[in-house]
Amino acid sequence: MAHLTLSIRGLLLALMSVLLISVAQLSMKWGMGTLNQLWSDLVMLWQGEDYSSLFSQALAPVMAVGAGLFCYALSMACWVMALKRLPLSIAYPLLSLSYVLVYLGAVYLPWLNEPLSWVKGTGIFLILLGLIFVLPKKNQTSDKS
């Protein structure tokens, strides 16, 4: 198997995959949470209640879930292309950035509004620190160990 070198295009594809999967997680979290709140209304729909108001309430969360699934598919396509261009030892640790992005999104997006905690913040710091240790430095061409 040919030796894979660090490629800017591969890094960009991997980072795009991370961004898309983070957007997918946040979209689906909001969409499914909102649909869950509408569950009793959805049951009434099956019993012949007013369709138009329920449809207007459920449209945005259903679209958010659909957009999340679409982002998952795009993320997978980017990931497959990134794996063709990057060594797995470089590509795979980049996936941990999605934990960072999803946590920050869950905390700072007002419609998710999850609590900020120092324990989780420490975990995020450790993930980022781990990436610094694992990813090669600019002047490092190959791992001699």
From Swiss-Prot:
Pathway: Bacterial outer membrane biogenesis; lipopolysaccharide biosynthesis. GO terms for biological process: lipid A biosynthetic process; lipopolysaccharide biosynthetic process. Residues 25-61, 111-114 are periplasmic. GO terms for cellular component: plasma membrane. Keywords: Cell inner membrane, Cell membrane, Lipid A biosynthesis, Lipid biosynthesis, Lipid metabolism, Lipopolysaccharide biosynthesis, Membrane, Transmembrane, Transmembrane helix, Transport. It is a multi-pass membrane protein. The chain crosses the membrane at residues 4-24, 62-82, 90-110, 115-135. It is found in: Cell inner membrane. This is Probable 4-amino-4-deoxy-L-arabinose-phosphoundecaprenol flippase subunit ArnF. It comes from Shewanella sediminis (strain HAW-EB3).
